[in-house]
Amino acid sequence: MLVQSRSQTQSSVVDSSKPKIDYDVVIVGGGIVGATLACGLKDSGLKITIIESQQPEVAISKKQAYALTLQTGRILKSIGVWDEIVTKITTFYQINLSDSDYHKVVQFMCQDLGTDQLGYVGEHGIILSAMYEFLSQCPNISWQCPASLKNVNYHPDYVEVEIENQGDLNTFYGKIIVAADGSKSRLREEAGIKTHGWKYWQSCIAMTIKTEKSHQNIAFERFWPSGPMGVLPLPGNRCQVVWTAPHAEAQALKELDETEFLKLLEYRTGGLLGKLELLSDRYVYPVQLMQSDRYIQHRLALVGDAAHCCHPVGGQGLNMGIRDGGALAEVLKIATQKGEDIGQKRVLKRYEGWRQKENLIVLGLTDFLDRTFSGNWTLKVGLRRLGLGVLTKVQIFRYLALRLMTGLIGRAPKLNPEIHG
């Protein structure tokens, strides 16, 4: 991809031949985060297009499920898609936190937080299908699909975008382009935005299982020396398992005979779910922490994995991206109402200042949890079990931990005053 920028000294020349703006917002990436942003702009008066390389039926076929925080539920409700999603996903009312074979279990309950639930677990296809159906009814939003981005030229007053759609090259013009194209974002890389972080010594192995015993709408997070294991309840007495282990061990687990694998998984879940059955393949992917130096530049904004990636412990990754999408939608809507140019850095810095610091806190917290709760050094084991004991006995610490886990700390996007107050 070729990305070019014209200096501000050429603005008088560019202004004299300024093309007609086709779209106010160009979103590259039609996944959940990009779709969240588009849904959030449904009534903004802005004209939006989404560039997506995959056909919708392919995009929604991804076999993955996510923990969704209370804050994520509020954001999705405010943009109008939650009612279609919530009836098809699981609401959980308890979180059990434990350390390998240690007998103490921290049980987080709704009354610890003063809410009716603690979170949700939703499958990728259900969430994205609801968003796609919603977007199909928005006259101000269009799709370029399947299409790939070829060139981007940044001008003082607009961004020039060239795409390839079924062999044809098309060029159009927008006020801002948004990178929702994942952790290997070409838009970010070609814009010269640097990232910092590291690859962990671990990979995740993810799968869907069917359980003999009811999961009772409880989410489990169990820490082992090799890494954490999350078990998330799904409808139909199914669970999504995310098992973190060193790279070689994760690959060995993927290749292990199914019967032996299930025996090991039954042991790791403490027998609480009874006999287990695999309903999906075992998917292995590496784990990394990444934070972009900048979330914005002139006429460009990064959201979701294009801006940051975190360890899966606590299930915060997608929730961070959805908050990015909601926050950017709010910033762009308010700027539009004020008559501001939504692609200018002074507007986009409001989004960056809001989300970059909040995401850094979550990145630091997930990294701390993984490093603290992994390993079998005597001092580490003693400290983490002391921490679990404190959480068991001191209600205020449970309350604060739950505020973090449920996304209720920090500034929330306010896309619908009737919901957010």
Task: Enumerate the predicted regions with their spans.
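C-terminal helical "tail/cap" subdomain of flavin- and related membrane-associated enzymes
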Residues: 4-6, 330-421
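Conserved N-terminal helical subregion
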Residues: 18-22, 88-190, 198-203
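N-terminal Rossmann-like FAD-binding beta1-loop-alpha1 element of flavoenzymes
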Residues: 22-50
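Conserved Rossmann-like nucleotide-cofactor binding loop
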Residues: 33, 56, 184
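Glycine-rich FAD pyrophosphate-binding loop
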Residues: 42-64
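N-terminal FAD cofactor-binding segment of flavoenzymes
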Residues: 63-100
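Conserved FAD-binding catalytic core of PHBH/FMO-like flavoproteins
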Residues: 76, 158, 166-171, 176-282, ...
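FAD/FMN-dependent oxidoreductases across multiple families
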Residues: 251-343
